[in-house]
């Protein structure tokens, strides 16, 4: 992979329609795996949260969904969005490199592209959420200079 060849391409409507159910299922699985709530409640939360951000489908204002492309090959996807009335920071809500392409520098290069996208839109920062059990992602974000701004913890009794 050459960083020069890596690009963000807006998803087509068909790609979005295929991606969205996978996104909901993946988000629900992360919530349930964290122990925050049972699987069914996690699924319902994932559906509500996703519907809130994509009320108008792929063309919802403030939400940007990209394929991460290495030349003509899709290696992952990225969802950037405005979380509320204050547009800054832009949030990297979902960022995933396909399993077959992990460990080859795509994640680092894609995050740099996300930062460029935020700058191009006049943002002064790019935020993200990382689940506590995702040590690979946490290590990547630390190495790129991201700082912890909030943390949730729990103890099962």
Q: Could you tell me what each predicted segment is?
A:
Residues 1-5:
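Actinobacteria-biased recognition of intrinsically disordered, low-complexity terminal regions
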Residues 6, 10-99, 117, 148-157:
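Acetyl-CoA-dependent GNAT
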Residues 87, 105, 136:
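Residues that form or flank phosphate/diphosphate-binding pockets in enzymes
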Residues 89, 111, 119-129, 152:
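Conserved GNAT acetyl-CoA-binding A-motif
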Residues 98-100, 104, 132-133:
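Active-site acidic-Proline motif in GNAT/NAT acetyltransferases
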Residues 103, 116-120:
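Conserved amphipathic alpha-helical interaction elements at protein-protein interfaces in regulatory
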Residues 105, 122, 145:
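Short glycine-rich hinge loops at helix-strand junctions in the catalytic core
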Residues 108, 112, 132-150, 155:
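Conserved active-site alpha-helix within GNAT-family acetyltransferase domains
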């Amino acid at each position: 992979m050459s960083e020069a060849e890596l690009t963000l391409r807006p998803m087509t409507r068909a790609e979005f329609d295929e991606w969205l159910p996978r996104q909901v299922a993946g988000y629900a699985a992360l919530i349930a795996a964290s122990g925050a709530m049972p699987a069914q409640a996690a699924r319902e939360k994932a559906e509500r949260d996703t519907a809130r951000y994509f009320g108008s489908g792929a063309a919802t204002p403030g939400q940007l969904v990209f394929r991460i492309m290495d030349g003509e090959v899709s290696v992952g996807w990225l969802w950037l969005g405005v979380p509320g009335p204050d547009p800054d920071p832009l949030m990297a809500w979902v960022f995933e490199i396909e399993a077959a392409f992990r460990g080859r520098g795509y994640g680092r290069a894609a995050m740099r592209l996300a930062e460029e996208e935020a700058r191009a839109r006049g943002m002064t920062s790019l935020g993200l959420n990382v689940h506590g059990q995702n040590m690979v992602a946490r290590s990547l974000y630390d190495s790129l200079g991201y700082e912890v701004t909030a943390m949730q913890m729990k103890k099962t009794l």
